[in-house]
Curated annotation (Swiss-Prot):
SMART domains linked: DKCLD, PUA
EC top class, as a word: isomerase
Keyword annotations: Isomerase, tRNA processing
Enzyme Commission number, as recorded: 5.4.99.25
Function statement: Could be responsible for synthesis of pseudouridine from uracil-55 in the psi GC loop of transfer RNAs.
Protein known as: Probable tRNA pseudouridine synthase B
Signal peptide coordinates: none
Family membership: Belongs to the pseudouridine synthase TruB family. Type 2 subfamily.
Organism: Methanopyrus kandleri (strain AV19 / DSM 6324 / JCM 9639 / NBRC 100938)
Domain of life: Archaea
The keyword Phosphoprotein appears for this protein: no
Length: 338
């Protein structure tokens, strides 16, 4: 069996932040995401929901909106009605991060039912041939055009075999059809196969280990509304920043924040810390020194260039996540340590 190996999705990399300048943040402005007032916390929150079998992803989002009385919410990747598991739901202002979750790597646990008997060693060998880049044509009932698409399978681990039922863990690129994968493995084995059950265990930085149920969400909201008890709600709703943990990270000075909130690009002098490994073209998340998400952008330089440059645009700002005025304009503001 191959289930005991350390298998990782692309963003499960070893990460290291490199400091460019020793700078502190002014406590008068902004606040750590976990310490936001509860109303703001909800509006900038993400729920790592464990979707039950039955409802559509859209219906689950509608229920969450109804519980909180929200006008806007969105999910990070559709699950079919019968499929259970990780469905990140972004609330109100946090819906701006949804587009970063949709292409993020996914992990599933599936039961593949074989239509004939197969030797275990042969099964292991054939399954391993499906790791790497494969070509998939979406199923007939898919909503997308049925042209062949390359998809990356990062790993397939056989966890258990019970007769003709094979329990597998699959780490894959977004948009991979596990139903089609099971069918194609069956064809390669010469006996045929179909997907009997499916559960999503990871979406980007969210995993089933800390997923919550709709019941948890409703109870936590009612505890807060009726008794003023915030703790359960702060457990089921997480800061939107947790939904950006799969992206390369750049931290900036207080004095650079407001300009970016107005749509300016990030220049070299504003950078305090950079994640090692950033390359031009990478989608990056820009944070304050308190850990607040400021914006999403596309890197224009390598991490080394960002560390050593004293001028020039390092990141093109693509999506602003923080409201202007959270931090003062640069003039008249000196952060401690500058």
């Amino acid at each position: 069996m191959s289930g005991d190996k350390d298998r990782r999705l692309p963003f499960d990399r070893d990460r290291e932040m490199i400091t460019k300048a020793e700078v502190e943040t002014d406590p008068r402005y902004g606040c750590p995401p976990e310490e936001r007032p509860i109303e703001e916390y909800i509006m900038k929150g993400v729920i790592n929901l464990d979707k039950p079998a039955g409802p559509t992803s859209h219906e689950v989002v509608a229920w969450v909106k109804e519980i909180f009385g929200l006008s806007k919410a969105g999910h990070g990747g559709t699950l079919d009605p019968k499929v259970t598991g990780v469905l990140p739901i972004a609330l109100e202002k946090a819906t701006k991060i949804i587009q970063t979750l949709l292409p993020a790597g996914k992990e599933y646990v599936t039961i593949m039912h074989l239509h004939g008997d197969v030797d275990e060693e042969e099964l292991e060998r054939v399954v391993k041939e499906f790791e790497g880049t494969i070509l998939q044509r979406p199923p007939l009932r898919s909503a997308v055009k049925r042209r062949v698409r390359p998809k990356k399978i990062y790993y397939i681990d056989i966890l258990e075999i019970d007769g003709r039922d094979v329990l597998m863990r699959v780490g894959c690129q977004a948009g991979t059809y596990i139903r089609k994968l099971c069918h194609d493995i069956g064809e390669a084995l010469g006996v045929g196969a179909h997907m009997a059950e499916l559960r999503r265990t990871r979406t980007g930085p969210f995993s089933e280990e800390n997923a919550v149920t709709l019941h948890d969400v409703k109870d936590a909201y009612e505890f807060w509304k009726e008794e003023g008890w915030e703790e359960p709600l702060r457990h089921v709703v997480r800061p939107m920043e947790e939904g950006l943990e799969h992206l390369p990270r750049i931290e900036i000075r207080d004095t650079a924040v407001d300009a970016i909130c107005h749509g300016a690009n990030l220049a070299a002098p504003g950078i305090v810390r950079v994640e090692k490994g950033i390359q031009p073209g990478d989608l990056v998340a820009i944070f304050t020194l308190k850990g607040e998400a400021v914006a999403l952008g596309v890197a224009k330089a390598t991490w080394k260039e960002m560390l050593h440059a004293d001028r020039g645009i390092m990141v093109d700002t693509k999506r602003v996540l923080m409201e202007p005025g959270t931090y003062p304009k640069a003039w008249g503001l000196k952060t401690p340590g500058e």
